């Protein structure tokens, strides 16, 4: 079993750099671990239109791809809203779909690490989180 402490720490550090939204000030961070052992992290980037907001998980996947790495083993997510409730951060449906598509392309069932700011986490394979994927 892989120790995801470094991956979660990278996600938490990215969260601290997130482009905050108003008025709620919600921030998210994410980090991916590639098959080559590299970690790429990113944060959310909020848009005033909301529909143009870039999610942390999307940005982390794009960050890895920008470095030529698309074989993702694991992705960690953290968020401030979830931590107010002392819960683990779960990716939204749109991010689950994108992670699932990455999984299809790489043929790796990506481990999704849902963490809080304390570093505590739960994890599930993306195949467990996406009950009705598209394309099926």
Positions of the model-derived regions?
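C-terminal binding/interaction regions
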Residues: 2-21, 70-136
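Active-site segments that bind and position negatively charged phosphate/pyrophosphate groups
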Residues: 24-26, 45
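Short beta-strand scaffold segments in enzyme catalytic cores
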Residues: 27-35
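Hydrophobic "anchor" residues
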Residues: 38-39, 121
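N-terminal cap/recognition module
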Residues: 42-43, 60
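Compact, glycine-rich, soluble single-domain proteins
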Residues: 44-46, 50-56
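Short amphipathic alpha-helical face segments that pack within enzyme cores
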Residues: 55, 59, 94-97
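Short, solvent-exposed cationic patches
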Residues: 56-77
């Amino acid at each position: 079993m892989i120790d995801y402490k470094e991956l979660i720490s990278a996600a938490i550090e990215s969260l601290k750099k997130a482009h905050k939204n108003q008025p709620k000030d919600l921030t998210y961070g994410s980090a991916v671990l590639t098959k080559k052992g590299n970690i790429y992290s990113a944060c959310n980037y909020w848009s005033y239109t909301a529909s143009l907001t870039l999610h942390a998980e999307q940005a982390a996947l794009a960050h890895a791809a920008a470095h030529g790495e698309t074989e993702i083993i694991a992705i960690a997510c953290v968020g401030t809203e979830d931590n107010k409730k002392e819960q683990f951060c779960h990716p939204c449906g749109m991010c689950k779909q994108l992670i699932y598509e990455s999984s299809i392309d790489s043929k790796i069932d990506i481990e999704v690490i849902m963490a809080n700011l304390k570093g505590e986490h739960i994890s599930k394979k993306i195949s467990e989180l996406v009950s009705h994927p598209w394309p099926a």
